[in-house]
């Protein structure tokens, strides 16, 4: 999104099919070697227990927290155009000949149609985005907290040796505290200067957002008898929602959880091994995103 054009379209009530400004087109990102980056620093805290209630059975539980300062990442093209909009709003349409917005957003000169369209917007007219200089920067403090559960069971039978393993990861907190320009955007939105419909991406509560699912499960079972070994495994990733899309009724676009199963068969020789494997046995397709 070019949120300068988006804001103009919203306040003027423009027809979505008008072709003078395009706020939903793609934008090129240009990056160069980042300078003056600070090293990321993290503090890790964890507590765990280990239980062995039966011979061959081990159960583990670990709760952990990771706080990382000076997290390195991208401010984001959408956030850059939102900051460009904020500077334009603060300027109030004054002295447009000398107005300079966000220097990271490089635009074409506005043509006469765009200038005429901006006349009733209270903003200085700007042309379409050519590209956005979006270099890596130290963004914020990121905090992730969760719990890992592990169950391991090994036992022998007359039919062979069995090994079962389950690992579950449950994320309770994934938060990124804003800093710098992003903190300025948050304050502007809280004050009402920026419209609430403009999403500020990459900060705040990120759990369940854009691939940050809150749980993951892996299950692995192995049977071995003499030179033969068969292993089956499953991987389940939890659901999340895609912030850039909404359904027609305004609700979130949810991406459901996904489970895949794998199978391998191996035969062991004295100094070699033959192994046949099939990943995603059921040919499960990833959910639409």
Where are these regions (language model features)?
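Outer-membrane beta-barrel signature, preferentially recognizing the C-terminal barrel domain
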Residues: 1-60, 132-147, 211-215
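Outer-membrane beta-barrel architecture
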Residues: 36, 46-50, 62, 150-152, ...
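Repeated loop/turn-to-beta-strand initiation elements of outer-membrane beta-barrel proteins
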Residues: 55-59, 159-162, 227-231, 271-276
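C-terminal beta-signal and adjacent terminal beta-strands/loops
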Residues: 58, 67-69, 172-175, 234-245, ...
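Gram-negative outer-membrane beta-barrel transporters
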Residues: 64-244
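C-terminal beta-signal and terminal closure region of outer-membrane beta-barrel proteins
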Residues: 210, 254, 285-289
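Short, surface-exposed loop/helix-turn segments at secondary-structure junctions
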Residues: 244-253
């Amino acid at each position: 999104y070019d949120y300068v054009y988006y804001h103009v379209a919203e306040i003027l009530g423009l027809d979505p099919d008008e072709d003078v400004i395009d706020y939903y087109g793609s934008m090129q990102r240009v990056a160069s070697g980042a300078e003056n980056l600070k090293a990321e620093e993290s503090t890790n805290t964890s507590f765990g227990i280990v239980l062995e209630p039966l011979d061959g059975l081990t159960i583990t539980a670990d709760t952990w927290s990771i706080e990382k300062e000076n997290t390195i990442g991208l401010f984001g093209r959408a956030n850059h155009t939102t900051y460009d909009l904020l500077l334009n709003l603060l300027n109030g349409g004054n002295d447009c000949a000398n107005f300079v917005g966000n220097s990271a957003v490089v635009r074409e000169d506005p043509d006469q149609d765009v200038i005429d369209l901006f006349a009733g917007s209270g903003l200085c007219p700007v042309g379409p985005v050519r590209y956005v200089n979006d270099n890596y920067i130290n963004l914020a403090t990121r905090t992730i907290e969760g719990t890992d559960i592990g169950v391991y069971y090994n036992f022998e039978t007359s039919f062979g040796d069995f090994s079962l393993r389950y690992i579950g990861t449950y994320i309770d907190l994934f938060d990124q505290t804003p800093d710098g320009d992003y903190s300025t955007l948050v304050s502007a939105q809280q004050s009402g200067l920026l419209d609430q419909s403009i999403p500020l991406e990459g900060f705040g509560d990120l759990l369940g957002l854009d691939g940050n699912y809150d749980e993951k499960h892996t299950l692995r079972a192995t049977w071995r008898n003499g030179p033969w070994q068969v292993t089956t495994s499953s991987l389940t990733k939890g659901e999340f929602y895609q912030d850039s899309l909404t359904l027609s009724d305004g609700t979130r676009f949810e991406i459901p959880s996904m489970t895949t199963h794998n199978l391998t068969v191996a035969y062991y020789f004295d100094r070699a091994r033959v192994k046949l494997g099939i990943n995603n046995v059921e040919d499960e397709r990833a959910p639409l995103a």
